[in-house]
């Protein structure tokens, strides 16, 4: 029997402007097929109905996803005031309604409570695990559960538009684990009018901006052609939050073999997590100690 082709060794980031109606995993699988890549992943799940920035990692770029966990993410979204739903978005069954509509001043006054280090309860329809089962599976089966509040850092929450009395547009910048649907739900409760997300768009993740993203249709149109390579962003972009240390050829060779390698002087302290580069190409991520980088993750680039 002929051996199945496992794909090509392609490494880099593809910044996809995710369309509504697809899961993040489905987008990753499509991109992987288009590039015929061996390995693929993504940095941060978007709900199926959400659009916007979905950074897709190919090959060695998948090793950098873990170092993006502290990256901030930005979202714009519209809240429908006066209605709560089972899913906290427009797809869910309506639970409660209210004729109350807050003023612009009341909305602005409520926002500071959602900024800083806060506690947030995930939506019932979320990927949070409860006794080994996904919350959304329990919810779809008609079950209800009390989900524990989680720590969340929120950089900012601000009004960017008020189309009419029933709607308000917001921008939300947060750390890992934030749920926009929970913000809409909780803001509606604080304002005494209920609320849910009408639409949601992610505009940036860490160093990745939606202005640099391409539509999935563009990726599919170029599938299995050399023109796709022009869409690849460097692997090292995901390491922007870590100090970069340059290495010599000899140091790079040691690091690639999993051994501590000498690095050139840089803005780093003993024990800091940093990444080593040779001519701008990532070699390894590790801890800096006395002129050497002790590798924790090595790149085959």
From Swiss-Prot:
Domain of life: Bacteria
Disulfide bonds: none
Enzyme Commission number(s) from the entry: 5.4.99.25
Record's keyword terms, sorted: Isomerase, tRNA processing
Gene Ontology BP terms: mRNA pseudouridine synthesis; tRNA pseudouridine synthesis
Catalytic activity of the protein: uridine(55) in tRNA = pseudouridine(55) in tRNA
Coiled-coil regions, chain positions: none
InterPro entries named among the record's database cross-references: PsdUridine_synth_cat_dom_sf, PsdUridine_synth_N, tRNA_psdUridine_synth_TruB, TruB_C
GO molecular-function term, one example from the UniProt record: tRNA pseudouridine(55) synthase activity
Catalytic residues identified in the record: 47 (nucleophile)
SUPFAM superfamilies named in the record: Pseudouridine synthase
Enzyme class: isomerase
Assigned protein family: Belongs to the pseudouridine synthase TruB family. Type 1 subfamily.
Described function: Responsible for synthesis of pseudouridine from uracil-55 in the psi GC loop of transfer RNAs.
Protein name: tRNA pseudouridine synthase B
Organism: Jannaschia sp. (strain CCS1)
Taxonomic lineage of the native organism: Bacteria, Pseudomonadati, Pseudomonadota, Alphaproteobacteria, Rhodobacterales
């Amino acid at each position: 029997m002929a051996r199945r082709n496992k794909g090509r060794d392609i490494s880099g980031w593809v910044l996809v402007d995710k369309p509504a109606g697809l899961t993040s995993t489905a987008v990753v699988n499509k991109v992987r097929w288009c590039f015929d890549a061996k390995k693929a992943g993504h940095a941060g799940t978007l709900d199926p109905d959400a659009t916007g920035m979905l950074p897709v990692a190919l090959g060695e770029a998948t090793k950098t996803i873990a170092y993006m966990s502290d990256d901030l993410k930005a979202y714009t979204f519209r809240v429908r005031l006066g209605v709560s739903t089972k899913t906290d978005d427009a797809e869910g069954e309506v639970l409660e309604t209210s004729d109350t509509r807050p003023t612009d001043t009341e909305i602005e006054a409520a926002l500071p409570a959602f900024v800083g280090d806060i506690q947030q309860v995930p939506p019932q329809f979320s990927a949070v695990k409860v006794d080994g089962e996904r919350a959304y599976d329990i919810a779809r089966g008609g079950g209800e559960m009390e989900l524990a509040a989680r720590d969340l850092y929120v950089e900012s929450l601000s009004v960017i538009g008020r189309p009419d009395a029933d709607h308000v547009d917001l921008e939300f910048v947060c750390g890992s684990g934030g749920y926009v649907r929970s913000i809409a739900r909780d803001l509606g409760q604080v304002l005494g009018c209920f609320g849910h997300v009408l639409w949601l768009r992610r505009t940036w993740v860490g160093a990745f901006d939606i202005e640099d993203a391409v539509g999935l249709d563009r990726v599919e149109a170029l599938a299995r052609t050399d023109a796709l390579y022009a869409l690849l962003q460097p692997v090292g972009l995901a390491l922007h939050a870590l100090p970069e240390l340059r290495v010599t050829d000899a140091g790079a060779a040691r690091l690639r073999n999993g051994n501590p390698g000498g690095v050139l002087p840089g803005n780093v302290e003993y024990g800091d997590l940093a990444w080593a580069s040779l001519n701008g190409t990532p070699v390894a991520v590790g801890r800096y100690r006395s002129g050497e980088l002790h590798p924790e993750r090595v790149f085959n680039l």
